């Protein structure tokens, strides 16, 4: 079964919830990443020279980009059944930064935890699954572009 209209709607509505507190949700997202994989701090230029996760325009922009790409992936999965990267350099950027498979797992866990918090009472297993499938589609496309 392909990605459904309902799954896309769940991703879109929770994306809007995420954006309502972009600063707080961005900090939460990167805090979870660094709790799970402290060495990943060096992968993010905007975190390299900081003591911890500090709010900044670059941090917010990157979080918004990651979550936005997952939202866009949901739309592609529904309409095309696969994710095609709009930015051909994403694979090369991830290779250059030294991103490996375990990093994708950590980011996925952080993304799902952040969406759960951002969604509040609207969170459900169905919403979680929609984000998980959309993220997996994006991660697969990025990994393919990394080879």
Swiss-Prot record:
A Pfam family annotated for this UniProt entry: Globin
Induction notes from the record: Strongly reduced levels in boron-deficient nodules. Inhibited by abscisic acid (ABA) in parallel with lower nitrogen fixation in nodules.
InterPro entries: Globin, Globin-like_sf, Globin/Proto, Leghaemoglobin-like, Leghaemoglobin_Fe_BS
Nitrated tyrosine: residues carrying this PTM: 30, 135
Tissue expression as described in the entry: Root nodules.
Post-translational modification: Nitrated in effective nodules and particularly in hypoxic conditions; this mechanism may play a protective role in the symbiosis by buffering toxic peroxynitrite NO(2)(-). Nitration level decrease during nodule senescence. Phosphorylation at Ser-45 disrupts the molecular environment of its porphyrin ring oxygen binding pocket, thus leading to a reduced oxygen consumption and to the delivery of oxygen O(2) to symbiosomes.
Protein family according to the UniProt entry: Belongs to the plant globin family.
Name of this protein: Leghemoglobin Lb5-10
Species of provenance: Pisum sativum (Garden pea)
């Amino acid at each position: 079964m392909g990605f459904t209209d309902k799954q896309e709607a769940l991703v879109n509505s929770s994306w809007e919830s995420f954006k309502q507190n972009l600063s707080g949700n961005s900090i939460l997202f990167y805090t979870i990443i660094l709790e799970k994989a402290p060495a990943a701090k060096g992968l993010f230029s905007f975190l390299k020279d900081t003591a911890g996760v500090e709010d900044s325009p670059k941090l917010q922009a990157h979080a918004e980009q990651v979550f936005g790409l997952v939202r866009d992936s949901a739309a592609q999965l529904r309409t095309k059944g696969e994710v095609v990267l709009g930015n051909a350099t994403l694979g090369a950027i991830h290779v250059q930064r030294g991103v490996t498979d375990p990093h994708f797992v950590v980011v996925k866990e952080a993304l799902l935890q952040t969406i759960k918090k951002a969604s509040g009472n609207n969170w459900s297993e169905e919403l979680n699954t929609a984000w998980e499938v959309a993220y997996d589609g994006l991660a697969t496309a990025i990994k393919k572009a990394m080879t």
